[in-house]
Each structure stands twice: as C-alpha cells, then as structure tokens.
Amino acid sequence: VIFLSEEMHRRAYNQVFEEFEAGVEWSEEYYDELMNTVGGGKPKMRHHFGRYGWPVSTLGPAPETDELREALVDALQERKTEIFRESVAAGRAEARPGIVELVDEALARPDLRTAVCSAATKEAALEVLNAILGPGRLARFDLLLLGDDVSRKKPDPLIYSLASERLGVPPERCAVVEDSKIGLEAALGAGMPCYITYTGSTRDQDFTGAQAVVADATQLSLALMCPAGG
C-alpha cells in the first residue's frame, strides 16, 4: 500500500535461494500468484515447499521434520530480510502515488486515530516506513502492528481486529486502505470498510465488497472515507 515493494521482495527471495543453493527461483508470474494467495514471507515459503518439495540447501539435505523445516524457513527469512533492508538503505524504496499526501492529511486530523498494519517483519517494515515516511511522520501514528506482533497473517482478520481493539475504535468506524484481495479479506473479516489501491500484480483480482477500487491513493478522498464527525 505505502510503497512499490513486490519486485524488491521477489529479488530478495531469489537472491537468498541462490545463496543457500536451494535450487528455487520465483518468476514474476509465480510471485504474483503467491502474493495473491498467501500473506507473509514465511507462509509463502511453507506454501511453496509444501507444494513442490522441500529443498536441499547449504544447511543440509531436504528437511523431513517440522523442526528442521522451520529452521530452514527461519534462516531463509532472516537472510531475505537483510537483503531487503540493504535494498531499502540503497534508496530503492519508492512511495506509491498519493500515499504520503493521504498520510499527512490523516495525521493532521485531530479526530482520527491512525495505524499501520503490515505483514512484514518488524525490522524490514520499520526500515521501509522510516525511508518512505520519515521518523517524524512515523512517530505520529497511534499504532504500528507488524508481522512479528500477530500469530496469524492476512487474510486472517487478526491484525485488524487487534488494531480496532488497541485503538478503541469500533470496526465499522475504521477505514482500511489495502492493495490485494488478501488484504481486503482481512479487513472485511474484521468488519471494516476497505478501500483498494491495486498494484500491477493485483489489478485483476476480485475486489467484491470493497468501498472503492482505484489505481492509487491520489484517487482516494479522506473526507469521504472518514467524514468529520462521522
């Protein structure tokens, strides 16, 4: 939602697969499929390996127990996060059109409470959010809920239900901005209105139930999403 991330994530996964000699490479088309099916990095890898087989890697033979499989996924994800953070530090993260302006408008409204709810690991998410929004803006959010903070990833509604609870705002009075069917399902599952800013990877998904489906945040109106006194 906040920045153009899909290709950066895909390249980071492919680099870590190469470093671990896992014999895996995710094409753009296949990564789109994963993005539209599974939320979170570790669940994506579990889904892929469960479907196509667990790989031999520099850590040893193909893992046969749950413990060894989780150890492999943990190691891959840890290194992938490092690679991704290096890309962010190199200035490769770019905000999606209109999102910074929408954030500024929301932060300027004293009647609104604001939150970021992301499946990304805490380290990677904070790196990106600081790079895109800056520490000053980020500090003004009322709540940050990141991948490490919840036990179940989108499309499970847990992250949004928890946000509603912690903010003290009923779900029906929240407004969620998402970019995928997985995110939409999570928001709707929590009972929240959801506005979609689709990406090149998600534009053809079924967004039935969304309040609006637009190309980017320049086409969203905070006044309509969150009417003053509404």
Describe the function of each predicted region.
Residues V1-E33:
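Active-site neighborhood of HAD-like aspartate-dependent phosphohydrolases
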Residues I2, T114, V176-V177:
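Conserved SAM-binding loop
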Residues E70, R85-V116:
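Short, acidic loop-to-helix structural element flanking the phosphoryl-transfer center
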Residues V100, D104, T121-G230:
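Asp-based, Mg2+/Mn2+-dependent phosphohydrolase catalytic module
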